[in-house]
């Protein structure tokens, strides 16, 4: 299941939770975001039991989070562990996204 992060406080609590967090930064008007969204959801079901939290941030409704994360394009997927960004993928590439998830498990 994908968690929705709607404010900076939630973002900070989640990214500092000690778990691996993969966040999809997206926008409702972004075509590629809509295409990859069900794939991200599928990966959350496939890999979510492995101490990884999958989350989404709508960059338009949570602009403070997207500014904090320095988001410049959508979709952007960022991986966090212990409050630090450890990886990032820009673009709607399902193969690269699954590789990012698998690399995060290692």
Curated annotation (Swiss-Prot):
**Which chain regions cross the lipid bilayer?**
none
For molecular function, the Gene Ontology terms on record are:
protein-disulfide reductase activity
Q: Which Gene3D superfamilies match?
A: Glutaredoxin (3.40.30.10)
- The active site annotation covers 30, 33
The keyword Transmembrane helix belongs to this UniProt entry's keyword annotation: no
The residues annotated as site (Contributes to redox potential value) are 31-32
Q: Thioredoxin domain spans which residues?
A: 2-106
Disulfide-bonded cysteine pairs: these are 30-33
Q: What keyword terms does UniProt attach to this protein?
A: Allergen, Disulfide bond, Electron transport, Redox-active center, Transport
Record keywords: Coiled coil included?
no
Q: Which domain of life is it from?
A: Eukaryota
Residues at site: Deprotonates C-terminal active site Cys? 24
Q: Which family does it belong to?
A: Belongs to the thioredoxin family.
For this entry, the protein name equals Thioredoxin
Q: Which organism is it from?
A: Coprinus comatus (Shaggy mane)
Q: What is the lineage of its organism?
A: Eukaryota, Fungi, Dikarya, Basidiomycota, Agaricomycotina
């Amino acid at each position: 299941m994908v968690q929705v992060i709607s404010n900076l406080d939630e973002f900070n609590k989640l990214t500092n939770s000690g778990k691996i967090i993969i966040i999809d930064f997206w926008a409702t008007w972004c075509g590629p975001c809509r295409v990859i969204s069900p794939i991200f959801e599928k990966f959350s079901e496939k890999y979510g039991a492995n101490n990884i939290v999958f989350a989404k941030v709508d960059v338009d409704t949570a602009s403070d989070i997207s500014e904090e994360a320095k988001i410049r394009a959508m979709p952007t997927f960022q991986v966090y562990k212990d409050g630090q960004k450890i990886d990032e993928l820009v673009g709607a590439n399902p193969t690269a996204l699954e590789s990012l998830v698998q690399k995060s498990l290692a």
